[in-house]
Amino acid sequence: MNYIPTQTFYGRRWRPRPAFRPWQVSMQPTPTMVTPMLQAPDLQAQQMQQLISAVSALTTKQNVKAPKGQRQKKQQKPKEKKENQKKKPTQKKKQQQKPKPQAKKKKPGRRERMCMKIENDCIFEVKLDGKVTGYACLVGDKVMKPAHVKGTIDNPDLAKLTYKKSSKYDLECAQIPVHMKSDASKYTHEKPEGHYNWHHGAVQYSGGRFTIPTGAGKPGDSGRPIFDNKGRVVAIVLGGANEGARTALSVVTWTKDMVTRVTPEGTEEWSAALMMCILANTSFPCSSPPCYPCCYEKQPEQTLRMLEDNVNRPGYYELLEASMTCRNRSRHRRSVTEHFNVYKATRPYLAYCADCGDGYFCYSPVAIEKIRDEAPDGMLKIQVSAQIGLDKAGTHAHTKIRYMAGHDVQESKRDSLRVYTSAACSIHGTMGHFIVAHCPPGDYLKVSFEDADSHVKACKVQYKHDPLPVGREKFVVRPHFGVELPCTSYQLTTAPTDEEIDMHTPPDIPDRTLLSQTAGNVKITAGGRTIRYNCTCGRDNVGTTSTDKTINTCKIDQCHAAVTSHDKWQFTSPFVPRADQTARRGKVHVPFPLTNVTCRVPLARAPDVTYGKKEVTLRLHPDHPTLFSYRSLGAEPHPYEEWVDKFSERIIPVTEEGIEYQWGNNPPVRLWAQLTTEGKPHGWPHEIIQYYYGLYPAATIAAVSGASLMALLTLAATCCMLATARRKCLTPYALTPGAVVPLTLGLLCCAPRANAASFAETMAYLWDENKTLFWMEFAAPAAALALLACCIKSLICCCKPFSFLVLLSLGASAKAYEHTATIPNVVGFPYKAHIERNGFSPMTLQLEVVETSWEPTLNLEYITCEYKTVVPSPFIKCCGTSECSSKEQPDYQCKVYTGVYPFMWGGAYCFCDSENTQLSEAYVDRSDVCKHDHASAYKAHTASLKATIRISYGTINQTTEAFVNGEHAVNVGGSKFIFGPISTAWSPFDNKIVVYKDDVYNQDFPPYGSGQPGRFGDIQSRTVESKDLYANTALKLSRPSPGVVHVPYTPTPSGFKYWLKEKGSSLNTKAPFGCKIKTNPVRAMDCAVGSIPVSMDIPDSAFTRVVDAPAVTDLSCQVVVCTHSSDFGGVATLSYKTDKPGKCAVHSHSNVATLQEATVDVKEDGKVTVHFSTASASPAFKVSVCDAKTTCTAACEPPKDHIVPYGASHNNQVFPDMSGTAMTWVQRLASGLGGLALIAVVVLVLVTCITMRR
């Protein structure tokens, strides 16, 4: 069957369901203007007809003729007498129904009211044995019921339909009867993200999932529809999966062409299954037991035994409620104090307390059993032996405390209850055995109250209370203003919860005061109680009595008496023995559950920030210890953190890669350094040197030192060559007596004139005498000139490219092929490519990564959390031995101790000559806080990268999501794009990770089943509720102290709590490449690593034909202002001429500069302004507008701001860039020094040649 309903409607919305007619309605159409004739009915039938007419006017707008014979069949009572008396109650009933809406205590919200209007028509209850198990919904032309909901639809027409079942969608479907099609609701496949409506309020739809606040839905809601604001059905609820604060719904919904079923992990079906209990091998519904001993007030002891027999059944609490309220197949009126009824089957008790406030032990009526401190807001949940909020009769009384005084239950005023640590605590809530109080830090805990005689009863235990605050600030007082962070707290509600405590039958309480000596006889005074006695004098002096009894010829020391009472439960305390060895028990709900809430935490005062050159100075003013941390956003994060508790000043180095710092609970701040410096790149030599020294001090010192050394060497060499030439010129004349130096040589060498052979004569002599030497003399100066020319040429050729070396691998504006490109995996870094195609105008393609997400494939090994040691009440075998039996409990320990002689407040517990034995048990279980506070151990596998990329070309500007794997194709504006795989196989996650709340840790952990005591993983389970709990806590039992009933044990401290203290910094604060670590699901966001290859197929339709595009001519560029190393700090004006106005693609064809604009509007003989970003001081880049190209040349100045809160949008440099002015000065210096050197070389060569000729 097709599970997509057909939209069949009859022009109606939200109309009430027609009333049930006691006759069969004829389905033949009748004329609209004809009014059927009715015979005169009786008064009751006349009233019914009036009601039917009113309803029909609201629904079908037609009147239907009722057959006479069938109308007389439908009478609720067959009696025909006293018709006038029947009429009066009917009128009275109608009068009572009018004010009924005003009597509602809780008015439904707008969403609930809207759903109630629609649901009144389109949903029907599904019942099994009279109990509602779910709902069926009329959608379109079909009736749909979840297949897992057992029962029959509560409508005779729908119940007899033939349904077809689909296990794939968990639905049963049938065609709606024709006369009910007007009741059906519309449906829609349109589901924009937002909020929708259902029976319990708002439903949030996001990411393809429907979620509700936890607790808003429950079993029994299966089949309820979800509506949009127009009243159309968008989904049908099947179940839910608890995910902490919210519950994900399992639904059947529709897309445009098909039906889909959304089933979150851990989904439970929400069918209200009928719970069955047993009694004497007979099954019965737990909510309505048919047996006689099912009311506690009538037969308390038998009722408790029945509850103990069903304690492990799912319907136990329904049976408990039915037993306490004594309802048996009858309507029960609920009460706001109904959950207190269970306490009438329990009683307070006296228990051993080591310190009753005065340093001595006692059996205290307010003994402290447990203290829980899982809430980080300083709240404590304390369990005591007294019961609060109840009077001594067991009824609810908020101002009373009932406690055990001997064998009797007494009551006192609740106002006298006190809780202390280092100071008095503030009590926020009390119920039964539990107190919720906010306490200051301290080393002990004390609970006290005044009894009926105004005597203080107290108990004091050693307890270290030092709550850890939420967030990154250790504050003490809740602030007036701050930020809300997720946390846990004890909810102040006494309604039933998921937590529970075990109860058991109390033991026999020995009391020596019941025995009195009278003339050699022992008298047992019952006092209205049941006494179990045992006397060793005589025979058969063992038994129970409820009246006074005398044991003849006996002494008190030979008798033992104890009060026995098995019609009440009491808490399973390790300080009170249990009545028998069998594990018979009951259980009751625990109030004040731990729930997820938000806590207001303070915001540290913002630090005083001073920006310097590549550093930032923070002056911190903490009001309390505050965490300060920072990390680098590059490949090496170098994380740092410390707790600051006084005024401090911290200097953080800032690089071009960026840093992130966080102060207290303030949001993290990211900063990037800019290439700021003193001096000018286009000024005098000393200004240029100052400019480059500020940017690259080491390289500048090396370059200036090298240039200075070269200049000095060149000058020294020039002087040396000139001196050598002079010496060679004067030497012949100095050795020849009476020689006269020629006039020219004398002027050059400052020497007397002399005669010598001319150059021509010298060369002629060498030609005649030695031709080899002649050619050597001629070749030497020529070789020197050639060598000098090559050096100068090489220097000029090397220096010019030196000013334009950039990181080409991250080019954001490089021209790409038509079908391939490589974009940097950096969020916000624009990539632009110029695409040319024959016959079309060039087009600029822009790709920008908006968001990236690395999601590893995770395999949950186990969860671990804090454990609790469960210590049942010990079993004491008087005058005999007992044996341990194995139990399927984690880390179960059992020991039997002989030779024990326990005492209770009324005397010795045992009375025999042989030894007594005590059976002590203990085992480990998950703490109640595990649902909210646990760590998950995962094995991480290959991470997949998902990216959100903004694609712009032509008139298309769209953002799309794609998996970067080289296979997933996305379609944007008719173009096909395939991204990936990424250039580097990298992931911030190790093979083993631990997830705790919103933090992720790269940490090794033991495998499942191999935990060590006191370490992470000492307890392990697959989920927080699974039955596969493993524990290794080195739990050990010890021998009880003489005369005391207790179960001493020594557990190893929780490994989970130890791990919380020693876990160190999370990956959130030290991930490389600026990754933002998120959970649910675990992922790393916006990691700036690697490059993403892109394959694309762009159709011709995306281009503009040449004949349709403007023809741009006379394009010229003038740079108005330019600031390099700043985000689009350059402004250029492009002047042009064109034949017609239109849009043109503008693009930079060089990696030196990145343009901000992709397209511009051109007009005839106009100008356009573009912005560009560059890292060069003297950029020269080619710009094209449509088909025209020109070159822009700029002289850029350094930025003024040292630190900015955004990253650069241009390419970084590998080597220092040299400005055009600096190159000019270098060329001038090289030319001057080179000229001097050339002159010296020429002179030396000429002199050498002349002297060698002689």
Curated annotation (Swiss-Prot):
Q: Which GO terms describe its molecular function?
A: RNA binding; serine-type endopeptidase activity; structural molecule activity
Map out region (Interaction with the capsid protein) in residue numbers. 724-728
Which pairs are disulfide-linked?
122-137, 277-286, 291-295, 294-326, 353-459, 356-362, 425-439, 487-599, 535-559, 537-554, 729-750, 865-930, 878-910, 879-912, 884-894, 1075-1087, 1117-1192, 1122-1196, 1144-1186
The residues the entry assigns to the signal sequence are none
What is one Gene Ontology biological process annotated in the Swiss-Prot or TrEMBL record?
A: proteolysis
The segments labelled Ribosome-binding in the record are 108-122
The written remark on domains in the entry is: Structural polyprotein: As soon as the capsid protein has been autocleaved, an internal uncleaved signal peptide directs the remaining polyprotein to the endoplasmic reticulum.
The name under which this protein is listed is Structural polyprotein
Q: What is the lineage of its organism?
A: Viruses, Riboviria, Orthornavirae, Kitrinoviricota, Alsuviricetes
